[in-house]
Design a protein with these regions (language model features):
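Hydrophobic anchor residue at the start of the ABC signature
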Residues: 147
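ABC transporter nucleotide-binding domain
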Residues: 176-266
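Helix-to-loop junction immediately C-terminal to a conserved catalytic motif
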Residues: 50
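Conserved ABC transporter NBD signature motif
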Residues: 58-69, 75-76
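Catalytic Walker B motif of ABC-type/P-loop ATPase nucleotide-binding domains
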Residues: 158-162
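Conserved ABC ATPase "signature" region
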Residues: 100, 104, 111-129
């Protein structure tokens, strides 16, 4: 059983389907990233799981609490930390007083509030601004403070809606390093993002979403399952016989640039030995071999493109 269990979860707004039959299990201590374009249903999913909006159909449990059940709603709020899309911070409170206020709401003791405030603000590079009013903060600083607010009661589950959006590279690195620390603490995290590089660095698994879940897996697994690698072979001379031999080993187009021939391959460990053998048999004098793996962005765009084509066909 997972800490987050979602079964056939859907949400409609009138005739518009925002989330369509989402089924997903997220294990304890896992960092899971939802990827998708605007309007894909990522924020709606987080809002449903946090109990902020109701579902149209389906079922979900978070940390043992059934989402939408009034008997466990209070417990659910205590077990889940939420960084929403909009910060919703009081502009006249300082960073430290903001965390103290929310800590009191959750019943955190005075001593523990002070310890967590110092730890969270230090880790998110806000400690030097702890006594400054939120109205003086940049958008990125408010975003980091919102993450700290979500953790003031030390919840085992954390939902983050675009945690690195609007951050400069330094701010994004601060948040990324912070998430890696949380990951080491075995906290279960569900985040959504447009930042594919961030997801690749932080997430154990990712799901590509476009109202429904298109694909789920590790970043490496998705790349290998949906996109081709390429092997580039530099030769003394590229002859017609070498090109023919390379094409006979690949179902995709072979390209030639100068003395380098590039061949798409599905599984390099399986296909490259056969490719090298065929080129050598055709008289090719191989000087250097290199390989390139598809990026997560290429995989993401390929899957989204296929999904859009399927929707048009349907």
């Amino acid at each position: 059983m997972g800490v987050i269990e979602i079964e056939n979860l859907s949400r409609k707004f009138g005739d518009f389907t925002a989330v369509d039959g989402l089924t997903l299990t997220i294990a304890e201590g896992e960092v899971f990233g939802l990827l998708g374009p605007n309007g894909a249903g990522k924020t709606t999913t987080i809002r449903m799981l946090a109990g902020l909006i109701g579902k149209t159909s389906g079922d979900a449990r978070v940390a043992g609490c059934r989402v939408g059940d009034p008997d466990t709603a209070r417990k659910l709020r205590s077990l889940v930390g939420l960084m929403p899309e909009e910060a919703g911070l009081s502009p006249d409170l300082s960073a430290a007083r903001t965390l103290d206020f929310y800590g009191r709401l959750y019943g955190v003791s005075h001593g523990m509030r002070a310890l967590r405030t110092e730890r969270l603000l230090t880790m998110l590079d806000l400690w030097d601004r702890r006594n400054d009013r939120v109205r003086t903060f940049s958008k990125g600083m408010k975003q980091r403070l919102t993450i700290a607010r979500a953790l003031i009661n030390d919840p085992p589950v954390l939902f983050l809606d675009e945690p690195t959006a609007n951050l400069d590279p330094e701010g994004a690195k601060t948040v990324r390093d912070f998430l890696l620390e949380l990951k080491a603490d075995k906290r279960t995290i569900l985040l959504n993002t447009h930042q594919l590089a961030e997801a690749e660095r932080v997430c154990d698994r990712v799901g590509i979403m476009h109202t429904r879940l298109i694909a789920v897996g590790t970043p490496d697994g998705l790349r290998g399952a949906t996109s081709q690698h390429a092997t580039a072979i530099q030769l003394a001379v590229v002859t017609d016989a070498v090109v023919v031999a390379a094409r006979n080993t690949s179902s995709a187009d072979v390209t030639v640039a100068g003395n380098t021939i590039t061949v798409p391959v599905d599984k390099p460990e399986r296909d490259n030995p056969e490719l090298v053998k065929a080129i050598a048999a055709a008289g090719g004098e191989i000087q250097f071999i290199s390989g390139t793996a598809p990026s997560l962005e290429e995989t993401y765009l390929r899957l989204l493109g296929s999904e859009k084509n399927d929707k048009v066909a349907r």
